[in-house]
């Protein structure tokens, strides 16, 4: 197969950001897309098969655009742009970077980083209730938190309510030491951490004291009507159907709700059906409700986490297929008329 060359102009001041320390990112692009990248000052030459060169050029142009906008290029940016180049979406990736949800107390912009995350953020803007379902590391809770804080700062809502079911990893609150607050705090700690990072401790504590930010176990929602609030239910896979119904019927006028969960991390007793699973079936046709499914492609943590998530997804898919085959065989044996050779 004949090789082609493509020449890209990337100013020297952007090269270290784009190609990574010790050319780490350049090597990833070369290995994955099967191209050769040669850098001479601001001239970047890409050599390889025509389709591969087009993909690599699209990836490099995208990373250059990110760098021009002041972004620190990460391995996640590189891996995701490579993956999207195979789907011919690399050119439209820059549109995602244009969407800044809000900024942290340190001034860092919080943005969706994948097409799935962009769809999730847009759904939160447009719909009254949004279910974000997907594996760990896809930004479900963090982006929802950023959207809540942005709505609060813009006076779109009067308060933020964050809640979780207090059932995780097989622990029961009654068996844990301390008073109720000390028992539930570990379950709510990830929510506190995100709020501290985005708002800053001073602003967070001031709004907590005023009752404008509330972080509480799901059981505290019973019997209330929540008006003009941005409400986030995290770890929803650990709700029962009754708890989910109770929560969703608390919603009042002017409120927005985001429900996040990961069905692969359910901590309910073995025979208990998840309220999140039931809700996706019961409410899927309600127009004001959006269901956004995030996948391993939307994982923005360490690349190894993405591989782990993908391995578990493949395993669970194979297990489900095997269970269906067993059920089919069982059904065919039950329906078959016995003959004299059957025991």
Task: Mark where each language-model region is.
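Short amphipathic alpha-helix segments
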Residues: 13-31
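A short, structured beta-strand/loop element
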Residues: 31-38
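Short, surface-exposed acidic/glycine-rich loop or hinge patches that mediate macromolecular interfaces
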Residues: 13, 23, 50-51, 238, ...
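Conserved helicase motor core of SF1/SF2 NTP-dependent helicases
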Residues: 105-117, 122-233, 237-343
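Interdomain "pre-motor" coupling segment immediately N-terminal to P-loop NTPase/helicase cores
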Residues: 38-97
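Hydrophobic side chains in well-ordered alpha-helices
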Residues: 18, 25, 55-59, 244-247
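Conserved loop-to-helix interface motifs that mediate assembly, gating, or partner/ligand docking
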Residues: 86-108, 112-115
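Short glycine-/aliphatic-rich beta-strand segments at the starts of folded cytosolic domains
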Residues: 1-17
